[in-house]
Amino acid sequence: MSKKVGMISLGCPKNQVDGEIMLSKLADNGFEITNDVDGADVVIVNTCGFIEDAKKEAIENILDMVELKKEGVIRKIVVTGCLAERYRDEVLSEIPEVDAVVGIGSNSDICEVCEKVCSGEENIKTFGEKTCLPLDGKRMLTTPSYYAYIKIGEGCSNNCTYCAIPSIRGKYRSRTPESILEEAKTLADGGVKELIVVAQDTTRYGEDLFGKCALPALLTSLSKIEGLEWIRVLYLYPERLSDEIIDTFANNDKIVNYMDIPIQHCNSDILRRMNRRGSKEELTALITKIREKIPDVVLRTTLITGFPGETEEQFSELSEFVKEMKFDRLGCFAYSQEEGTPAAEFPDQVDEEIRKKRGEIIMEQQYNIFEKLNHDNIGKTMRCVVEGYDGYTDSYYGRTWRDAPDIDGSVSFTCGYELNEGDFVDVEIFDVNEYDLIGEVI
């Protein structure tokens, strides 16, 4: 009888892709993949370990599995992902009920590890060189069938002083265009209509292979794949967002005019101490240029409040910048003092409560901005993907092209004929409900 394996995948889409590759390898090697961990022979907790909140979530999930193991509901626990890589020794020593810890560079050993724990081996640790996984064969998608993430690179070479990712996942390494395009075609042939391009920094793609950014050429090639309706790009580093990249967005109908540009801050001194380049003036010029070239662009950004040494004046500068720029989408995180990062040793650490309060202020501001921008959508017709049907309200729900999965809003709409999950329809917006839109198919 084949062994049952379940997975709990946490964190970002990049980690989710790693999990999908592991699931595919397990299935190809005779394991039965189950969505319900109850009764599983092995539960893999694919963790994030990027910031404190992510670590807490990962540990809570591991401890939940420990309880199930004690109750006899599951047999074995394997921990993978960033937490496993970053705290390889601590996981087994602090949580001895864990049977195996698999580092990012050893994900391809997942089948062997699961075989070993099922046969009774304990305290397994396996780690290897931090490289891209071989992506031969299909992935077992954990997303709905109509969209998928595609990872074009691994690791990061930006070395922001607050970030542990380079130490966890290594320097930036691009996949070859041939590998990416082959995978994208396989996904499209399997019914994927929205392809979401991810890496720690998508604007760095190709620099290590060709000596220059190859993202525009890659996106152009992806747009020629039959069956893809939308190509969405996340994690665009602002200082490398060139005119060529902007023009590629502006001139290609398949690439949705949605730019995810994490700026983190606008104050020049804070950016310098973050080891990020640019200034408020340069960021303003970039955003202005993007909006001039792509009038209907949706801009998403991410900010950090309470970085070491951030004064009230510097925070006020950030607050005013947010009001002035009016980002369409914005996420704000209180600075997390991560051990092993340069910023963790900086003097003038900001009190944790102040960090959080500043983040709350930014998000309150952004809500007011978003509410106004959302009302501006009333009367517009937008292309949407159908994600499901709500019998309680007798309406469908989905996303507009302006919204990425999981992190942005949704739209509910009625239709005079039956729709299926993954269909693309034009919806006229006639009302809003906080972050979400309401409309009808035309």
Map each language-model feature to its residues.
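Conserved beta-strand core positions
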Residues: 5, 42-43, 148, 195, ...
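Generic beta-strand/beta-sheet core signal
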Residues: 8, 80, 198-200, 234-236, ...
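Conserved, mostly hydrophobic/aromatic
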Residues: 160, 180, 197, 233, ...
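Radical SAM enzyme [4Fe-4S]-AdoMet core and its adjacent flexible, acidic
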Residues: 12, 206-227, 273-277, 337-368
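Conserved SAM/AdoMet-binding glycine-rich loop
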Residues: 77-81, 86, 189-315
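Terminal RNA-binding accessory module
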Residues: 345-442
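Proteins enriched for Cys/Gly/acidic motifs involved in redox and nucleic-acid/cofactor modification
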Residues: 1-205, 244, 259, 281-292, ...
